[in-house]
Amino acid sequence: MKETKQLPGITREAEEQYLARTIRVAEQNLERNLAGEKKLADDLHDLMESYGAKDVEALSMLHNTQIIYEETKRDRERCERARKKPYFGRIDFYDEDLKKDEAFYIGRVGISENITDKVVIDWRAPVASVYYENALGRCTYSVKNEKTYEIDLHRKRTYEIEDDQLKDFYDSDVVANDELLTKYLAKNKKAVLGEII
């Protein structure tokens, strides 16, 4: 039996609300990351001041803290990128295995509210390949070392977001017959992909 649920962002108002939520989550993630980075920087400073060069255990702690600090800095940079432009695309589909409708927003960097609530998926996620590689209708995507999933792709949407504002969005099934708009979107798609790479 097919389970249906209300998918997010069907109307412009709903899309604007989802963007506002996504920006809020991205800002919270960035603030949390900055606080963690500052604490690690303070810890590094304290370790360097407190222990001598001959203290092997302290040197090991210093080394481990330095590695965690560098990773935290990389995470901050990812959070900053996510905050500037949270997502550029979206896919809606019916998952044949789960027997339910799904919607995923796709961005340069994944954004999560918590461990299970993905607000935006990373463009490199296996399911995101559907956005680039498939037309609407029945298709598949594969997860390495796992399996191939069958889906029915209902919507592929492209977003234009600038200065925290949703400028516009386009569904691929709506614009397929409009030659000028298709050319415009193709140009913007190259720009989006260029930004990603």
Which residues fall in each region the model found?
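Extended, charged low-complexity regulatory segments
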Residues: M1-I196
